[in-house]
């Protein structure tokens, strides 16, 4: 139950630390996170804060959205997300507040969630790292097939969960315990060590890591 930020993946680059070692980092644009609603147990049955991010053209905002954003006194965003919070942390926020990248600090560990790149319909070798069969020595047109997918008349079926070919990627993915390398409060940029899921310009959610001591 921690507050996070929604940002946009700008791309990857590198920075040099004090020892001159090259550190690969992902640049995340974390600007324009606004609180649109604070939900309490009395009115909603649970405690959470609703946040909008990014910008949306006025002609793309319907009346329901326009009224919701106007009530909060914030600019219309391109999406909404909720973060479950305790009542104590919820008391510190109100509709219209802006959450900035300053909530993170250098050296902190964060979890980054995004939508992985879609690879389309892929076979078992690419999707599940299966080994290929022989390229010759009697093998005819079965070089990349998965092989046996079951047993005999008993059980007479393919068990659920069997790894097979299918849609690969384009799923929600989280990378845990990435180190914050730099926080640019002026430009609202966050630099984290390593790669994060998703393509350039895709949305990502950054939260304080839940496994810091693990």
Swiss-Prot record:
This is Large ribosomal subunit protein uL3. One of its GO terms (biological process) is translation. Part of the 50S ribosomal subunit. Forms a cluster with proteins L14 and L19. Methylated by PrmB. The lineage of its organism: Bacteria, Pseudomonadati, Pseudomonadota, Betaproteobacteria, Neisseriales. The keyword Ribosomal protein applies. The keyword Zinc does not apply. It comes from the Bacteria. HAMAP family: Ribosomal_uL3_B. The gene is rplC. One of its GO terms (cellular component) is cytosolic large ribosomal subunit. Residues 131-155 are annotated as: Disordered. GO terms for molecular function: rRNA binding; structural constituent of ribosome.
């Amino acid at each position: 139950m921690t507050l996070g930020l929604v940002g946009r993946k700008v791309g990857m680059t590198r920075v040099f630390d004090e020892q001159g070692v090259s550190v690969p980092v992902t640049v995340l644009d974390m600007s324009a996170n606004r609180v649109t609603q604070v939900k309490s147990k009395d009115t909603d049955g649970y405690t959470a804060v609703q946040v909008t991010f990014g910008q949306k053209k006025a002609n793309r905002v319907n009346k329901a959205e326009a009224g919701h954003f106007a009530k909060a006194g914030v600019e219309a965003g391109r999406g909404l997300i909720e973060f479950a919070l305790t009542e104590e942390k919820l008391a510190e926020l109100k509709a219209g507040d802006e959450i900035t990248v300053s909530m993170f600090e250098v050296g902190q560990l964060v979890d980054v969630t995004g939508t992985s790149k879609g690879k389309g319909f892929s076979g078992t070798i690419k999707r599940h790292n299966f080994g290929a069969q022989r390229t010759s020595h009697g093998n005819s047109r079965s070089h990349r097939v998965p092989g046996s997918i079951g047993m005999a008349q008993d059980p007479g079926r393919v068990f659920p969960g069997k790894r097979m070919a299918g849609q690969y990627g384009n799923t929600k993915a989280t990378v845990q315990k990435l180190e914050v390398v730099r926080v640019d409060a002026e430009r609202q940029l966050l630099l984290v060590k390593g790669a994060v899921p998703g393509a350039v310009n895709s949305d990502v959610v950054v939260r304080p890591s839940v496994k810091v001591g693990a």
